[in-house]
């Protein structure tokens, strides 16, 4: 699973996910990308499930770029534990994804294969997504 090697603070507040992404809204590395149409948390397990489904679809051809990383710790208190006595233990890691962010990119394969791989990856995610194509400067492919 993806997780940071070390962090400055072990626990974070939850915060809110509002607004559009500031960067990473275009496909930069590959030819096709999977763009988030909603804001949400994406867990490390969901990212790994997407990666595996894309790798199995591509079958040793093409390249995959993962543009999100789970760097936010999520805590929870044990079942049957009363409130108080401090914040719970870290249970997992999530990536904060805002609307408009390109999360995954694929390159080096034909259009049909890339779209099929990204559709499989999208089915593993809890948010609405859109498959986008890379455009060169000037609007041409």
Swiss-Prot record:
Say yes or no: keyword rRNA-binding present.
yes
Please give the CDD domains that the UniProt record associates with this protein: Ribosomal_L16_L10e
| Keywords, ordered alphabetically | Ribonucleoprotein, Ribosomal protein, RNA-binding, rRNA-binding, tRNA-binding
- Any Pfam family matching the protein: Ribosomal_L16
One Gene Ontology cellular component annotation? cytosolic large ribosomal subunit
> InterPro entries from the entry?
Ribosomal_uL16, Ribosomal_uL16_bact-type, Ribosomal_uL16_dom, Ribosomal_uL16_sf
GO MF, one annotated term? rRNA binding
* Gene3D superfamilies named in the record: Ribosomal protein L10e/L16
Biological process (GO) annotations? translation
Which HAMAP family does this UniProt record tie to the protein? Ribosomal_uL16
* Family per similarity comment: Belongs to the universal ribosomal protein uL16 family.
Q: Give the record's subunit note.
A: Part of the 50S ribosomal subunit.
Q: Which purpose does this protein serve, as stated in its record? A: Binds 23S rRNA and is also seen to make contacts with the A and possibly P site tRNAs.
Q: Name it.
A: Large ribosomal subunit protein uL16
């Amino acid at each position: 699973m993806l997780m940071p090697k070390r962090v400055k603070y072990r626990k974070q507040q939850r915060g809110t996910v509002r607004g559009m992404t500031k960067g990473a809204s275009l496909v930069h590395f590959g030819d096709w990308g999977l763009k988030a149409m909603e804001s949400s948390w994406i867990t490390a397990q969901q990212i790994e499930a997407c990666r595996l489904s894309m790798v199995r679809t591509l079958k040793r051809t093409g390249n995959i770029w993962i543009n999100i990383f789970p760097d936010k710790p999520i805590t929870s208190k044990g079942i049957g534990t009363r409130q108080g006595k401090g914040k719970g233990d870290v249970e997992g890691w999530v990536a904060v994804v805002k609307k408009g962010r390109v999360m995954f990119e694929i390159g080096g394969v034909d259009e049909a294969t890339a779209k099929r791989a990204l559709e499989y990856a999208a089915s593993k995610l809890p948010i609405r997504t859109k498959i986008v194509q890379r455009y060169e400067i000037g609007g041409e492919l």
